[in-house]
Amino acid sequence: MAQTSTYSYTERKRIRKSFGSRDSVLKVPYLLQMQRDAYTAFLQADTAPQKRSNEGLQAAFNSAFPIVSHNGFVEMKFVEYNLAKPAFDVRECQTRGLTFASAVRAKVQLIIYDRESSTSQSKVVKEVKEQEVYMGEVPLMTDKGSFIINGTERVIVSQLHRSPGVFFEHDKGKTHSSGKLLFSARIIPYRGSWLDFEFDPKDILYFRVDRRRKMPVTILLKAIGLNPESILANFFVNDNFRLMDSGAQLEFVPERLRGEVARFDITDKAGKVIVAKDKRVTARHTRELEQSGTTHISVPEDFLIGRVVARNIVDGDTGEILAKANEELTEALLKKLRAAGVQDLQVIYTNELDQGAYISQTLRIDETVDEFAARVAIYRMMRPGEPPTEDAVQALFQRLFYNPDTYDLSRVGRMKFNAKIGRDEATGPMVLSNDDILAVVKILVDLRNGKGEVDDIDHLGNRRVRCVGELAENQYRTGLARIEKAVKERLGQAEQEPLMPHDLINSKPISAALKEFFGASQLSQFMDQTNPLAEITHKRRVSALGPGGLTRERAGFEVRDVHVTHYGRVCPIETPEGPNIGLINSLALYARLNEYGFIETPYRRVVDGKVTMEIDYLSAIEEGKYIIAQANATLDAEGRLTGDLVSAREKGESTLVSADRVQYMDVSPAQIVSVAASLVPFLEHDDANRALMGANMSRQAVPVLRPEKPMVGTGIERVAAVDSGTVVTANRGGVVDYVDATRIVVRVNDDEAVAGEVGVDIYNLIKYQRSNQNTNIHQRPIVKKGDKLAKGDVIADGASTDLGEIAIGQNMLIAFMPWNGYNFEDSILISERVVAEDRYTSIHIEELVVMARDTKLGAEEITRDIPNLSEQQLNRLDESGIIYVGAEVQPGDTLVGKVTPKGETTLTPEEKLLRAIFGEKASDVKDTSLRVDQGSQGTVIDVQVFTREGIQRDKRAQQIIDDELKRFRLDLNDQLRIVEADAFDRIEKLLTGRVANGGPQKLAKGTKIDKAYLASVEKFHWFDIRPAEEEVATQLESIKNALEQTRHSFDLAFEEKRKKLTQGDELPAGVLKMVKVYLAVKRRLQPGDKMAGRHGNKGVVSKIVPVEDMPYMADGTPADIVLNPLGVPSRMNIGQVLEVHLGWAGKGMGQRIGDMLQREAKTAELRKFLEEIYNSRGRKEDLSQLSDDEILAMARELTSGVPFASPVFDGASEEEIKDMLKLAYPDDLAQAKGLTETRTQAYLYDGRTGERFERPTTVGYMHYLKLHHLVDDKMHARSTGPYSLVTQQPLGGKAQFGGQRFGEMEVWALEAYGAAYVLQEMLTVKSDDVQGRTKVYENIVKGEHAIEAGMPESFNVLVKEIRSLGLDIELERS
């Protein structure tokens, strides 16, 4: 099926040949949709206040207001809120270390009622005061779905938590030694007390509130208003007996008798024995009894003994209670009943199998007598030690489950609750009702009786996602709740004092709650910005950890495991290795959230075996009701499922069904995996564990200097790059007017330009910006002046993108062969050419900060005047003491000069005299300058100076501000120039050929305006021309107004920018000035760096070999990387081998295209070859859309290799790869390269001897990545450094400038060698013998190389610890 849609700007330059068997039915949705939508719904900033729905901020305000005073005569009502424009934009916040946020202002009314006129029914308003009150700052989300908090980019990860509602489960027989299943139920609200019900091993049912002490469930049932009779009536059916003088008559109910063993002869009306004693009653027996018309069965006396009375039996004459409900019948009681003339007796019906007497037994151990007593018992359990007054008891019980302020089931909870207990409606009150509690107990008893099934808590229908918006709303609500208490206290004063709303509301608690959440919550994380893929994955992450979630230690295997409901919702592959495995997941490619927060995945509807284009999103619960075919099921031309049996899923199980039973079908084979996993080609051929590593390591790939598209991709590369926001896309279509390295200017198409607005889009590109991981964020334009663009076209590449596709590595020529042991155990051998060509060179940007503080001894000063430094050491600093931009610095170089006042020392008279003469002040300050760390070097690329308000700026700070303003003015002038040029072009088109009523240069009335006349008049006088047509005159006037408006807005923008730059900066307390220096460090590939492919095939560079020593092919092409073939079979990641073959084919085709271009072949020949590549196999491409020039441009782009897409689970087959290899390497070319018959292997030659290797080697191109584990960051050496305070042993780790640990095993090794002196040295002077090491320094200074080992400090610590246990221990010195 050919691609019918038109190609985008970048696709016209390079089309990726796809092997997908069919076109995607559904485009991959915008990947950051979940984050963006959730926060938009939270803020509702663009919705008019009256139209805002009750969610997010609006819901938080509605829940807190109105606040009523204790006496009820003052009330504070919420009217609406609005969000102010943020003071600084995203870039400014990042530079200045601020939070990108917007102030919330709420309009509230203070209503005071008149005490005298008001009655209890109606209140008379005395006074209303309305005012806007500041309610804290809410951080805003950037376009890329992140937040800027204190200048750093952060992500709020969504949380997967157990949905509110009711859950039934059992302990799987683990609690009791007999293995008996103990059933339990739990009602979980969104906020409020948890209510648990549980059976104990004796089958008594208990409840507990908030996991406190358990109590019999009948106490709760009595507390909600049931008496013992009604409790029994709710849970049991009755057996009706008629008492006789001896024995009784039992009302015959066939179902209850069936299956029981007769304890006596059962006879019919005629006295015929139907069932003999000790025989089991069968269906045949009950049928006989029915046919004989039996209504009652005679039973002996002992059949009644032990039965339980269903209701109170009262003596009709005296009113005395003869037997209470739930009392067991005894001989004495029967005698008493007969004596009182009781004939009809109702007892509860129970049996061992499916009608246990659990509630009856529970009622028997319950000592409470009535509703109030039951509530007192609950009060005592909740508040032990407090006196239970009647008001307190009733209030507590109401607050537990019935008060909307303290208990909220939420919409989701109510929907899940109703669904579970079998109600049809999805809505209802947000608090519990008595019926709800009763229904749950009934279901739990039914479960114990063997009816129904328990819930699976790992089912995604029972786990929901809490997004950014919901988490932020909860925090805001917390802040408002704190305010509510304070306001309530003060509202009473508003009657007497003339207080306004802002006097009553203090916004600090709100700000504190939000600040704490966005800055320090477990779910607010420092954004992983290593590359675009890391960024996008972080925002799509779903975590089960965090507040209200699980903890690593307590999470069992089941929660972490892949569940059938993960299909199409959560990726089964991408999850971290280590303690968080399975707790942190990634959203699948097409997944989205529904209104309740459950994850849904799309399916195509199938009607009578025919697959339609209708798409339904199903949640995990809905999916269980349908039979769903796989995406790769074969269809005929009409879209019908073919074959007798179709592979499908029913209730999560894979099965084969007939086509007519299928109800839905997957939309895409890639639907089950996440973005990172969907970028791994041939994922279907990799072992899951290795695929997991591959997906995770793709996120750690460092952006290299020149990104290169993957030769073998999956087709998701373009989507991921655009959605990550790293590339720049055109907001509107148009023509490129101007391009340079920092800016792209696009003149917008007339049909897309908004009337009266400037028809120009200006895109400022990011240059050398530091990411959170110190990698380089850098954008480069890929358009030329005059290029035509459509909306959404990629116009500039970012870090790790190439022509709008994610490109996290480089395509390397790989040979799978051992090479002198240098690729033993996953080591990697690399050609020197790779390093020389800077293929894996990356730029890292480090930020170094120095602050000048106000100390007790005086202010620190940033200055060039530093004591004891030579002029040579200061020659790179300017007069303000700050290094120049562009300086190349080495370890130890001074970047910013700073001096700190020292404490005054007493001076001798001579020193005083000298200081008086020479005015020397060097002795009272110490040098605390910012210097380059050991082990790092680089180029200074930027300096930022921040000065507190009221402190005078130095020259450097002023110069930075001037440069920034100059740049901004230049930007505005350019914009104005383009806007004016554009406006005058439009005017020229508008006026040419029109008749004028007059104008400049004495233009006569009725003259036709031509281009020559317009050229003779200065452009600014064109507005003075008076066209005859009214409409033209109006258009001319509107253009003039728009231009003037633009000029005015530009002047305002410049003024605002100047104001922002010249105002003082917000700095931490006590800081007067802060200087940030940015160093760019170039990191070349070197031995020790970690590298990996995309299939989990990771390794460390062991050696960089001269290119002439590398194995080479028959035509002289040397390999770039040599990998160990033993790394493939045991790891079972065969995907890498298929990638190598297909990459080899792509490279060969590129070479053939290059040859055609070199011999200047005709375009028709090129077209024919491209048709062969793109349209012989896999998805067809419509190359007729491209002009000859575009074909040539595309061919030039393809000379480096034809890129392929092998979509996940729908990739290239072996046959297709073979066909592509044959197309790429005709016989003559294959022979020249020394390829085998299959073209997948080649005979290589040893670079050192020139001899041919005995066997052919697998060669080809693989996309190989350099990971962010660079040896430069890990290398570290210590001479002397910091020691631990208690043990006096050296600290560990590079960050602490620590030493190497000489551990237990290393000690054993030295013991085994008998190296006693080395061992003594290691354990004493090189570790924690304080006197010993001081002596060693002395000896070294003296030139003596001797050690005197003493007592290790850790021994003293041990002695002290033993003494702390009360054992006296002393060291005897002999």
Curated annotation (Swiss-Prot):
This is DNA-directed RNA polymerase subunit beta. It catalyses: RNA(n) + a ribonucleoside 5'-triphosphate = RNA(n+1) + diphosphate. Its EC number is 2.7.7.6. Belongs to the RNA polymerase beta chain family. It comes from Acidovorax sp. (strain JS42). One of its GO terms (cellular component) is DNA-directed RNA polymerase complex. It holds the Pfam family RNA_pol_Rpb2_3. InterPro entries: DNA-dir_RNA_pol_bsu_ext_1_sf, DNA-dir_RNA_pol_bsu_external_1, DNA-dir_RNA_pol_su2, DNA-dir_RNAP_su2_dom, DNA-dir_RNAP_su2_hyb_sf, RNA_pol_bsu_bac, RNA_pol_bsu_CS, RNA_pol_bsu_protrusion. DNA-dependent RNA polymerase catalyzes the transcription of DNA into RNA using the four ribonucleoside triphosphates as substrates. Keywords: DNA-directed RNA polymerase, Nucleotidyltransferase, Transcription, Transferase. The RNAP catalytic core consists of 2 alpha, 1 beta, 1 beta' and 1 omega subunit. When a sigma factor is associated with the core the holoenzyme is formed, which can initiate transcription. HAMAP family: RNApol_bact_RpoB. It is an enzyme of class 2 (transferase). The keyword NAD does not apply. One of its GO terms (biological process) is DNA-templated transcription. GO terms for molecular function: DNA binding; DNA-directed RNA polymerase activity; ribonucleoside binding.
